[in-house]
Amino acid sequence: MELEKIDEFLSSWSKGVIEIGKIYREGGDYIKSAKHFLSTHYAFEETDVLFKPTFTKEVVFRNNKKDALSYFVGRDISEDNGFALKPWGSIQLAELNTLIEEDLTAAMGTLKFKPYEIEETTLVAFTFIFRKIDETLKIKVHHSSPVT
């Protein structure tokens, strides 16, 4: 059951990132979409979150919702171009390892990010540690980095 929830979460997370970029391309309210994405997938509103995004150098960690939003849509931190605005055409799970215990759920694996209308892919390693909130998984710790 918990493994199904992890699979569903990862699918929803990937679709959410793609959707933000799609709304941006179409001239829609991508900020609203990104805020909804963060509220749905990250536990910023319920607890402390540790977030180390894939492509950060100057401000390495984004441990609050405002800074996480900047990473995904490029607003408040100068190095942010908007990770979700690339836009991505597909995000595919390449490898998944899980740890499911009584009070801990974690996923570690790789995702293949393919930009919209471009054939190159970027392989990213990720670790998500989840907290169950109202029977829903949300990210409490997120670390990701490119696989080079």
List each model region and its residues:
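Extended aliphatic helical segments
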Residues: 17, 49, 59-60, 73, ...
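Residue-level marker of positions within ordered structural domains that often coincide
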Residues: 18, 112, 135
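Functional cores of ribonucleases/endoribonucleases
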Residues: 82, 87-118
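Short beta-strand edge/turn micro-motifs at domain boundaries
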Residues: 100-108, 116-148
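Membrane-proximal amphipathic alpha-helices
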Residues: 2-6
